[in-house]
Amino acid sequence: EFVFSLIPAPKQKGLDYSVMEEVIGKTSYKGLCSAVIYGPNASGKTNIIEAMDTFKTIVLRGHLRNAENHHRYNAASEMLELIPNNALKTPEPVHFSIQFLTQGMLVDYSFSADLGMFLEAEYARKILSETLLINKELIFSRNTDLVFGNLERIQDLLVDAFEDNKTGAFALAKSGLNATELFLMNGFRTMFSAKLTALISEWLKQKLMV
């Protein structure tokens, strides 16, 4: 496990120009606007960068299928069979998560996936879990089942006429889950909140620069 944090150290001095601060509810959050990764050769710097880029591209594509066109510098983001550790003897889940601030919201999004073994291109990939929290309140959690939190927290971002159709939306969302598709970018976007999905997508496109 590796955590790349942009939270400034409590006693860090001299970086005020690069620290953003936002108050959400009664909590003040601080974050660095950028960071530099340095270290000796073969220390894992490229792995960190490519892991963040791979997470970003998978989320924006919305599924675990390979990209149709292969033209990016980071091959693993387009051919997911390159992601698993080549030293593994049995498949192990791959986990991605991110926490960020946008439009006055603290967003926590994560998913884990079974991608098979290294170079196993024909493996039946599947999403194992997926979770979205806004301001530390559960919006949805997907494991063996799909569970929703209190959607009143995002009332202003819900699709039109959601209240009139929410019973059917919940039922359809649970029955229509696709093992290879991220719920955030598919069912949640179409049946619950295209606005929230768009905010997350735009942040990944415009703010997560790797």
Where are these regions (language model features)?
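Short, flexible loop/turn elements at secondary-structure junctions
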Residues: 8, 41, 100-104, 113-115
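Conserved amphipathic alpha-helical "coupling/scaffold" segments
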Residues: 87-110, 127
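Post-Walker A helix-loop "phosphate-sensing" segment adjacent to the P-loop in P-loop NTPases
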Residues: 55-67
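Pre-Walker A-like glycine/lysine-rich segment at the N-terminus of P-loop NTPase domains
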Residues: 1-54
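AAA+/P-loop NTPase substrate/partner-engagement loops
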Residues: 68-89
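Charged, glycine/proline-rich intrinsically disordered loops and linkers
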Residues: 8, 13-25, 73-76, 153-166
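Electropositive, glycine-dotted interaction segments
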Residues: 107-210
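Short secondary-structure capping/junction motifs at helix and strand boundaries
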Residues: 64-68, 106-109
